[in-house]
Amino acid sequence: MGKNIFFEQKGPFFLGELFTALQFKKKIKIFDIRNLQQATNRDLTFFDHINYISLAKSTKAAYCITTARLKDYLPKTCVPILVKNVIFELCRVTRQFYPNADIDSPDLTLKNSKKIKISKVKFGNNVLIGKKSKIGKNSIIGSNTIIEHDVIIGDNCTIGSQVVLRNSLIGNNVVIQDGCKIGLKGFGFIPL
């Protein structure tokens, strides 16, 4: 996974800024929060379930949010940050790096598809497309559909009518039925 194209990132942060209740010997800068597999020695990661032991053992992360029960699976190069609830702390820290990621703001860059030149794509009526969106060849987009900024749709896709696509990377040969909303905020929760 490369750079996050959907959300503005803040940081870097000192580790002590992210975990104010903990004491750290050094002033270490953390540049991003990533999963176990993609984290680098400049990143923070998280490890919350034994299903990810193999990934934990090979992570390149500098620090890892985890529990006392799982810490021994991390490599010596990764310092465990012990917490009671990994998912809660992950959400709290992620919000510092990506403070607007949980807000569904309207896309003010939308333009009518008739004003945008995309070859080999068929559009229904009243289709709106955001800035830097890409639609693959031989795709069909139904009427009254909104494709927000930075969304990428592959080749040979059929997107139904009254669909909203946000924060999404859609592969090739995908069919999305009428009325679907993909990439919008759902009914998430943080277990306490």
Write out the residue ranges for each language-model feature:
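Structural signal for interior beta-strand "rungs" in well-ordered beta-sheet cores
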Residues: 46, 110-192
